[in-house]
Amino acid sequence: MLDRRTKIVCTLGPAVASKEGILGLVNAGMNVARLNMSHGEHADHEANYRWVREATDESGKAVGVLADLQGPKIRLGRFINGEEMWAEGETVRITVEDVEGTHDRVSTTYKNLAQDAKPGDRLLIDDGKVAVVCREVDRNDVVCEVTEGGPVSNNKGVSLPGMDISVPALSEKDIADLRFALNLGVDMIALSFVRSPADVDKVHEIMDEEGRRVPVIAKLEKPEAVDALESIVLAFDAIMIARGDLGVEVPLEQVPLFQKRAIQIARENAKPVIVATQMLDSMISNLRPTRAEASDVANAVLDGADAVMLSGETSVGIDPQNVVRTMSKIVTNAEEGGKVPPLTHVPRTKRGVVSYSARDIAERLNAKAIVAFTTSGDTAKRVARLHSSLPLLAFTPHPAVRSQLALTWGAETFLSSEVKSTDDMMEAIDQSLLGMDKYKEGDMIVVIAGTPPGISGNTNMIQVHQLGQTLREQ
């Protein structure tokens, strides 16, 4: 059984590039494996995907696979000398022309920069380490004054906070990566630099062309996403609070409260939420986290996040398994000693009301568990957002849904056969749970499901059930 309720997402990379390395992460507590399409070749991701599936089969644990698209990342071009030092007060030019970069003039991958920029706009380079301000636009060049100096080098990222940029939601690379990931068989897709709810439409269009739809996660890292938060949550299947780029694009001091607000809105809408970036960053090169990092992880848990994510800590860190074990300890301790704020919104949908009622009945009867029998995963997510202290057991006949629920708070998943009636459903639950040490005949559980079974989004039934009752009646 899962003692830890909050899930852990681990980024794969050179530090774990083997079946043994990935199996080590699974055994340490990884729930979702992240394929970061910003790095590595398709062959690397294909190998990692295969090793995750092999490790899942060997361990018997359900692990989801998430493909994270790079998005339309804007970068500087290359410098003749590789690196230059820009000092405060200097004038530099960033051009849309394809030139070899010098101290005074360098190109950018964003070919509409001169069209979109206007005097007063800020450009942040290398995650904000260097800052410049547009003073004028001279044909193909944006003439800038350096306001915060530092080194600039080949292909460094450029952030354009507040600038109304005209880039598509998906680059050509993203489209190729998306098609590759769908054909590979990943369980979820994350879309970077989401600015509006309409950004999901192009992803769905390509999914339909490939004949396969999977959940799409909106990565919140742009000011436009902050402003359109509620509509983005409704349009996408889940959200990721990508605090690295977000903290560059919006004032850093606003990020913590935005995190709390985003988690609350996602929970109200039964959408899983991941908190990401620099959670245990020092453990890339150290065996212990800082006290501030431990507090950050615990705070995300107490905010109500479904999952916390590791990036470089597991992809290139010195001891990825130790990082996962450390995060698991921090999470478990926070869950044991803290309390997530209860949801205060009043559900108005049938599925919402039924999920609240199932939780209330189970807790008042001191049931052994809440069991969600689900076709799409929605029933389990609606119960999970309530953060009951009771175990949440999710049964589904679909392997893909089982893997997708690896991201959902508290959900322990079981693969069942297709059922045609409520009696079939109870029998499948009895057979699975009575084969486990934790449950015995006569234990009371509360089952939430849709009837007739097999219809997605039809949650309409609560049944108080004693384990073994169905088997005794045969």
Stretches with model-predicted labels:
Residues 1-474:
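Non-catalytic helical/linker scaffolds that mediate oligomerization, partner binding
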